């Protein structure tokens, strides 16, 4: 229903317009307060790069963050990552992730980034505090924030926006009548726009999410998705249909598609009934970090990696490296 409203296919968005006007007014006043100095942003002693979006829902920010961390590491630059930690409920914040940190504490995306990259990661609703605890423990060269474009309390040196190239901005309205956190005109003030799938416009950086082999949660075995019989797919991400479409493009024959809420907490009680012993369950890597502790032998996940082409990604990396020098 939300997808239909935000795409403009349902007239119900008209009923939500008063709330959207209020959202736009409040968010605009907040930005104005920072712009004219009524509110002040905290500036970290190292460069800060924000990877965010203008819309609610999954656009592919986390794969971009992972790509940036890995690419900078290959060039000798140590990046740390901060996040709000959506879906996590730690006893106290800020929280510096360790190998024992759970998704219940830190949220799924920070744990995924930590496990994939090995980079220092800290979470807190106050991202400035997350940066401070991160820097106190790790002498990183640069900080990347996973989301936080609208968190103006943290000063930033570069802003990168990730857009879903298929959905773009939906009906173009602010939340809740539409998907927008800020208006599309905000793109004129950011440093780079990365478009995930679809068609990139002039000046934008095209990106694709490339899947690899499916990985068994229990054993680590790898198989081609097309070789997994009796397959049931589940996805607790911002836009589950994208994951299901990716599986089908890999040759999967899905017996069922189960969309879940983004950042939804998962337990054995939630997941185990989704498949029989004769079926295989496949999920996103973001869901896998929540399920690994109670995984079954017929549960798999599909890793994806951001892939770029052309010279623009390298130019972006050069810009980030110049901040450190």
Swiss-Prot record:
Annotated positions binding ATP: 55-62
Enzyme class of the recorded protein, top EC level: transferase
EC number of this enzyme: 2.7.1.130
Reaction catalysis annotation: a lipid A disaccharide + ATP = a lipid IVA + ADP + H(+)
Spans traversing the lipid bilayer: none
UniProt GO cellular component terms: plasma membrane
Biological pathway: Glycolipid biosynthesis; lipid IV(A) biosynthesis; lipid IV(A) from (3R)-3-hydroxytetradecanoyl-[acyl-carrier-protein] and UDP-N-acetyl-alpha-D-glucosamine: step 6/6
Biological process according to GO: lipid A biosynthetic process; lipopolysaccharide core region biosynthetic process
Keywords from the named record: ATP-binding, Kinase, Lipid A biosynthesis, Lipid biosynthesis, Lipid metabolism, Nucleotide-binding, Transferase
Superkingdom to which the source organism belongs: Bacteria
Stored Pfam families: LpxK
InterPro entries in alphabetical order: LpxK, P-loop_NTPase
GO molecular function: ATP binding; tetraacyldisaccharide 4'-kinase activity
Annotated function: Transfers the gamma-phosphate of ATP to the 4'-position of a tetraacyldisaccharide 1-phosphate intermediate (termed DS-1-P) to form tetraacyldisaccharide 1,4'-bis-phosphate (lipid IVA).
HAMAP family xref list: LpxK
Protein family membership: Belongs to the LpxK family.
Name this protein carries in UniProt: Tetraacyldisaccharide 4'-kinase
Organism for this UniProt entry: Enterobacter sp. (strain 638)
Gene this chain is encoded by: lpxK
């Amino acid at each position: 229903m939300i997808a239909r409203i935000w795409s403009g296919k349902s007239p119900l968005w008209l009923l939500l317009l008063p709330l959207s006007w209020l959202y736009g007014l409040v968010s605009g006043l907040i930005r104005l307060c920072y712009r004219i100095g009524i509110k002040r942003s905290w500036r970290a002693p190292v460069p800060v790069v924000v990877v965010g979006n203008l819309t609610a829902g999954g656009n592919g920010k986390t794969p971009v963050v992972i790509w940036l961390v890995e690419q900078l590491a290959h060039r000798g630059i140590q990046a740390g990552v901060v996040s709000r930690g959506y879906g996590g409920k730690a006893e106290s914040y800020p929280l510096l992730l360790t190998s024992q940190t759970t998704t219940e504490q830190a949220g799924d995306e920070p744990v995924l980034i930590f496990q994939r990259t090995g980079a220092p990661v800290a979470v807190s609703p106050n991202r400035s505090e997350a940066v401070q605890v991160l820097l106190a423990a790790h002498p990183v060269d640069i900080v990347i924030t996973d989301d936080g474009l609208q968190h103006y309390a943290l000063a930033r040196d570069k802003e990168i926006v990730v857009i879903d190239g298929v959905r773009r901005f939906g009906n173009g309205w602010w939340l809740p009548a539409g998907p927008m956190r800020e208006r599309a005109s905000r793109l004129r003030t950011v440093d780079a726009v990365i478009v995930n799938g679809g068609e990139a416009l002039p000046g934008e950086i095209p990106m694709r999410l490339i899947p690899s082999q499916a990985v068994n949660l229990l054993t680590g075995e790898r198989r081609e998705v097309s070789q997994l019989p009796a397959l049931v797919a589940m996805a607790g991400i911002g836009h589950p249909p994208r994951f299901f479409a990716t599986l089908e493009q890999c040759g999967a024959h899905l017996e069922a598609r189960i969309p879940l809420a983004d950042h939804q907490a998962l337990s054995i009680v939630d997941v185990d009934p989704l498949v029989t012993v004769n079926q295989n369950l496949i999920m996103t890597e973001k869901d896998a970090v929540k399920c690994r502790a109670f995984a079954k032998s017929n549960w798999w996940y599909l890793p994806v990696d951001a892939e770029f082409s052309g010279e623009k990604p390298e130019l972006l990396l050069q810009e980030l490296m110049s901040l450190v020098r």
